[in-house]
Amino acid sequence: MKKTTLFILLALVIGATSCKSKRMLPVTERAEPDIPVREERFTFTREADRVSQQNNTFFVIMGSFQSRENADRFSETLRELGFSPSILLSETGFHRASVNSFLSEDNARSRVLQIREEFPDYADTWLLIKKDD
């Protein structure tokens, strides 16, 4: 009798704890994708770009190259896609292909996400913050 009672009690405990709750789980917001950010000093390779963008702080970077020639070729590809790229020469010696610049970090981040969505081949687009001298 004790064994039967113990078995029934054990079955009830296991059955009660294994049932899933029918409560709705709270909806969690989708996490914003990571956007790599780098802060560095750089110079504009064209005077016209410097004049038009010198007051901006946040730059959307679609490519980074050790060779200026490679950066120029990539810029041509970006022009064919409808962008107006600028080449920035970083303090580390890399030629950064920037397609937009902004005063606001939020606007720059939005643009990075938009590019990633519209141009999946450029999902590695990132954000460069101009370091003050």
Sequence positions of predicted segments:
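Sec-dependent N-terminal signal peptides
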Residues: 6-13
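Extracytoplasmic
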Residues: 42-48, 55, 66-133
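Positively charged n-region of N-terminal signal peptides that target proteins for export
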Residues: 1-4
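C-terminal motif of bacterial Sec signal peptides marking the signal peptidase cleavage site
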Residues: 15-18
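Long, polar low-complexity intrinsically disordered regions
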Residues: 6, 21-26
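Post-signal peptide N-terminal segment of mature Sec-exported envelope proteins
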Residues: 24-54
